[in-house]
Amino acid sequence: MRCSLLTPTSYRFHYPNPFRSLESIPPLSNSRYRIESGSPSSFKFSAPSLQRHSSVSVKAFDDDTFDFYTGDIFAATYAISSSEGEESDGDYALNVVTETTAQKLGKFPRGRKKHRIRYGINLGLLAFLSLLLLLMDSFAWKIVRLPLPPYFLSMPFFTSAILVTLAGYIFVPLLDRLRVHEPIRTLGPVPHNRRPTIPTMGGLFFVPIGVVVAIALNKVSSIEVLGAAAATVAFAAIGLIDDSLSLYSENNNGLSAKIQLLLEAAVGTCFAFWLETASLSSPYGMKMLVPLPSPLGLVFLGKLYLLLTSFYFVSMGNLVKATDGLDGLAGGIAALCFVAMAIAVLPICSDLSVFGASMAGACFGFLLHNRYRASVSMGDTGSLALGGALAAMAACSGMFFPLFISSGVAVLEASSVIIQVVYYSTTKRLKGKGRRIFKTIPFHHHLRLNGLKEPMIVTMAYVISSLLSLSAAYIGLISA
């Protein structure tokens, strides 16, 4: 391959060009490269260099370190391409500020981020959710035994998904310009692929859209939907406080764990007492009932129902938060959980089904911006809000068991943290030295240390969550 320096008009700069002539570009002088005597403006790679570039094995799920260069992303770069008239295998970007030789060519940052992971995972998730909701729309009237509008569940899902997708192209650059960036914490040995300047607080734009669409598509004001929306906003406010303190405090620490748990428990307790006094629509004629599969049937919990409600509010918020460690993991799992709950509560409260479908669409729309190589993260503003919304749906309908099943992956993530802490404390007390079961926690980071790539982990989580969501939806339908 013959490589020649480009003309000044071919240079690609990410910042105003600080170079005014070709003479300011450092010469490429190294013993591994041979300059042709007949062409002073071109050079040829030697055999060792070509062998080094041609022998690299690349897989679709491999991490690309070029895409997340942590140096000065505004440094000027220029490209070396093949000779005119030839097709190039790709351009090499040379950083003329930090490097003076072509010996370190493979270590230079590229001019722009190249998405090497296709949309296959997200398209598969969209196909699964769409087919499931369309199937339920065709049989919804048989389940509810009442006439329902066409596309009863599909309409809120696609409406929220489209609106959130479009809103992301406005709010993500705005968050980036306002420097609402996720603080970097080195808490473990796992190198995170997110670049240091990724915007956070994505929940500020996708959670309100999901809530507003759910309320707007309910022609009659539903007290269950309004209560679930209020709980969602309350948990989003807790997450917003935590994110704000993390961004603007000196040590980048948000709310302490105790204060955050107290606030979540307070919201859950208030919601439980509201349930006791509110007149909810129920096919059973009474409240505080938990539908379970036969032979258990309906179980009346009485005052224990209030404690169970508070427990689920605290648990679900932290379960979703625990899964928000990989790009697309929390958003995809939450979307599957919302669809499962939308189907499970359909015989009890069809208005809540619209709320669940709308929130699922909002999660999927956000997922298009939060997929692998994410451009934004939901932050605690989004993760706590999603957990609060799921808990509110379960509390208003009594579908705690289907929610537990559908959130099985999140339960596994949180359980790994609890098991690790308990085992470490016990072994340290008994043997004087603490031991660990997992290499690190949560469990998805343990898998990364064992060699699994991030997209593969997320794909596995989606498949498992899909199966669990189908099981949860079926159990909810046969229990109601």
Curated annotation (Swiss-Prot):
Q: A GO CC term? A: membrane
- Give an example GO molecular function: phospho-N-acetylmuramoyl-pentapeptide-transferase activity
**What is the recorded membrane topology of this protein?**
Multi-pass membrane protein
Q: Which keywords does this Swiss-Prot/TrEMBL entry list?
A: Membrane, Transferase, Transmembrane, Transmembrane helix
Instruction: List the Pfam families hit by this protein, alphabetically.
Output: Glycos_transf_4 (PF00953)
Is Lipid biosynthesis tagged as a keyword?
A: no
Q: Answer yes or no on keyword Acyltransferase.
A: no
Q: List residues traversing the bilayer.
A: 121-141, 155-175, 197-217, 221-241, 255-275, 288-308, 328-348, 349-369, 385-405, 457-477
Tissue expression remark: Predominantly expressed in flowers and siliques (tapetum and ovule inner integument), but also found in roots, stems and leaves.
Family named by the database record? Belongs to the glycosyltransferase 4 family. MraY subfamily.
What name is this protein filed under? Phospho-N-acetylmuramoyl-pentapeptide-transferase homolog
